[in-house]
A protein has these predicted regions:
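Glycine- and other small-residue-rich loops at beta-strand/loop junctions that grip anionic moieties
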Residues: 158, 183-185
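A C-terminal functional module that forms or caps the active site or interfaces directly
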Residues: 171, 190-191
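Transmembrane beta-barrel domains of Gram-negative outer membranes and organellar outer membranes
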Residues: 16-121, 126-153, 173-179, 183, ...
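Cleavable N-terminal signal peptides
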Residues: 4-6, 15
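Repetitive helical segments and hydrophobic/amphipathic motifs
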Residues: 11-12
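A general structural motif
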Residues: 159-164, 189
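Short loop-to-alpha-helix "cap/lid" segments that border enzyme active sites
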Residues: 164-170
Length: 238
């Protein structure tokens, strides 16, 4: 989670992702309890202009912590205003309803909780299309990266400072080392994003995606990120 999601107040289109999100929208996923995910991502996604990723890269450290009671908390350090004025922001997610064969998982959350940022609030539902197959693989779960979750659909609502936005997305596990991500946020200043995750091993992955603004006729953004997940009891175990 993070300053994420959208950012309906920014132009050109900007977006952020995290271990428990797709390219730019939240899912019902949680970092497992007593685990931590660390991520490094570009804070600016523009591909052209003086403030583009290639001219003035802004690295953004991110972290998510798995907590009891189906909770996840995140602490990020994000560029505010001016862009190089980095400040901490908090993110929270709660999944009160877990998925089963018929019922989708449901999550509620808040992002961008910090001085200099406008908070966002979201409600999202996630449903695994091959749920039965994934259940059969549960015995392998502790050997698999948390991004490997089958074929799923996601939908929900995002409340920004001044508007409601629709969220739609999907992720499809191709094999044990590659997952396709695609998602969309409504609104003229938001985007559709398509990308994928290369899963290196249980703990590490690399994600890349391109964004096309809803009112653009070209690729308008690029997201690159590296993620490392580990257990708190064994922080140096690779």
């Amino acid at each position: 989670m993070r300053r994420a999601l959208v950012l309906a107040c920014l132009a050109p289109v900007a977006a952020w992702a995290s271990p428990s999100m797709l390219n730019q929208i939240p899912t019902t996923d949680l970092v497992p309890e007593k685990q931590v995910s660390l991520q490094l991502q570009n804070g600016n996604t523009e591909v052209s202009g003086r403030s583009s990723l290639f001219h003035q890269p802004e690295l953004m450290p991110q972290s998510e912590f798995g907590l009891p009671w189906n909770l996840e908390a995140g602490l990020d350090v994000a560029p505010s205003d001016p862009p190089h004025d980095y400040r901490p922001i908090l993110n929270l997610k709660w999944t009160p309803v877990r998925e089963d064969y018929r019922v989708p998982a449901i999550a509620l959350g808040a992002t961008q909780l910090g001085v200099g940022f406008d908070p966002n609030y979201f409600l999202v539902l996630s449903k695994t299309l091959n749920y039965q197959q994934i259940q059969y693989q549960k015995f392998r779960a502790h050997h698999r990266n948390i991004k490997l979750r089958g074929i799923r659909l996601h939908g929900g609502l995002l409340r920004t400072a001044n508007a409601w936005r629709a969220l739609v997305g999907t992720d499809a596990e191709v094999n044990d080392h590659f997952v396709i991500y695609a998602d969309w946020i409504s609104g003229a200043q938001n985007a559709v994003a398509v990308g994928g995750v290369f899963v290196i091993d249980k703990q590490n992955s690399i994600q890349a995606s391109v964004l096309r603004g809803n009112v653009e006729d070209r690729v308008s953004g690029l997201i690159l990120q590296v993620t490392h997940t580990f257990e708190l009891a064994h922080p140096f175990e690779w």
